[in-house]
Structure formats: C-alpha cells, structure tokens
Regions:
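Glycine-rich, acidic and aromatic/proline-enriched surface loops and short helix-turn segments
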Residues: 1-2, 22, 28-35, 43-63, ...
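Short, glycine/proline-biased beta-turn/loop segments that scaffold the active-site neighborhood
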Residues: 1-23, 97-110
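Short, mixed-charge, low-aromatic patches
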Residues: 1-12, 37-45, 84-90, 158-165
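Mid-domain, small-residue-enriched loop/turn segments at the edges of structured enzyme/sensor domains
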Residues: 6-15, 46-84, 100
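Short, charge-rich amphipathic segments
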Residues: 8-23, 63-69, 133-146
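Second-shell loop/turn segments in exported
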Residues: 11-17, 25-27, 36-42, 67-73, ...
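A penicillin-recognizing enzyme superfamily signal
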Residues: 28-32, 78-169
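Short glycine-/small-residue-rich flexible loop motifs, especially phosphate/cofactor-binding loops
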Residues: 39, 51, 154
Length: 169
C-alpha cells in the first residue's frame, strides 16, 4: 500500500492471484504483469523521480502527473516516443532520438545540410542487461508467451499490460 499525494492509501489490483503473498523476483513480476511489484518499486522511488526518468528516455509529454499510480503506466506516450525510449535497451543504454531526414540536397545533388541523430546515455549497461533479461522473460515464460504459438522463435522481449479508456501506445 502506498500513500497518494492527497494522503490516501492506494494499492493496485492484479488480474489474478498468482503467488499472492509470496516473495517474487522483479523478473517474475514483470513477466507476469504483477502490479504489486510495480507498486513496490514506486515505494522505493517516488513519482517525481519516475517522471524525470520517463523524460530522460525521450518522452516529451510535460503533463505526466507525478502520482503513485504512475507505476502502472497511466500516462499518454506516443508510439514514436515509446520506440525512441526502447532504443536505449537496444543500444547499451544510449537513447537515439528519432531522425527522419539525414540530409538535404539541391536538384543537382549538392548537399545543402546534413543531420546526425542525437544520442544520450540514459541507463547503465548493467541495467540494460538486467532489463533485457526481464523483457525476454515476458515472452519466454510470462504473459507474452502466446506469441510463440505462432512459430516465432526469434530472440525478443516485450511488455504486456492492460489499458483503460482505449488509450494504447
């Protein structure tokens, strides 16, 4: 149970009661979409630190409310922002900002201007490794395991979840 910004107690609900009351790993919690694990982490952090972390991953939405329920993900993030944020996991902690134009040429092929992607280290390599292990567990043993029924054997990770009010990223 966490205390909200208004002083009220708040506890998340889970869709199931798997391993209710047991000690579980963060890996198991993420793989099985266990909201209590997320709430536990929020108790160790705080909503303001989480908002700063979200922004460091390239999410530009300045209207993200620093509330305890943010640990479950209830904020608007565009698909582009989500893809940009996940580049840090594929690039050993370096977030690569999206870049759609790399150069501009005139009608004779002369380069007028070039552009390079902005890169920023947002997470340590050791944290990236741990996160990738957990994201792979979602697909290999957790709530995303059904994707393997389609014969997909590629190394991949994921994060499943639910939504309210048709707000999907």
């Amino acid at each position: 149970t966490l205390i909200t910004e208004t002083g009220e107690p708040w506890s998340p609900r889970n869709a199931n009661k798997k391993r209710y009351g047991e000690m579980v790993t963060l890996k198991w919690g993420l793989a099985n979409s266990d909201n209590w694990i997320s709430a536990y982490l929020m108790g160790k952090l705080n909503p303001y630190e989480l908002v700063r972390l979200i922004h460091s991953f390239g999410v530009r939405n300045k209207a993200i409310d620093p509330v305890v329920s943010l640990c479950l993900g209830p904020c608007e993030i565009s698909v582009g922002e989500m893809v940009s944020a996940y580049t840090a996991f594929a690039n050993k902690g370096i977030r690569v900002a999206p870049l759609f134009v790399t150069r501009i040429e005139d009608n004779e092929g002369n380069v007028i201007s070039t552009f390079a992607p902005q890169m920023e280290e947002v997470i340590s390599v050791s944290s990236v490794y741990k996160m990738l292990v957990m994201l792979r567990a979602v697909i290999n043993e957790g709530t995303g395991a059904r994707v393997r029924r389609y014969g997909i054997t590629a190394d991949m990770g994921g994060k499943t979840g639910t939504t309210n009010d048709n707000s999907d990223s």
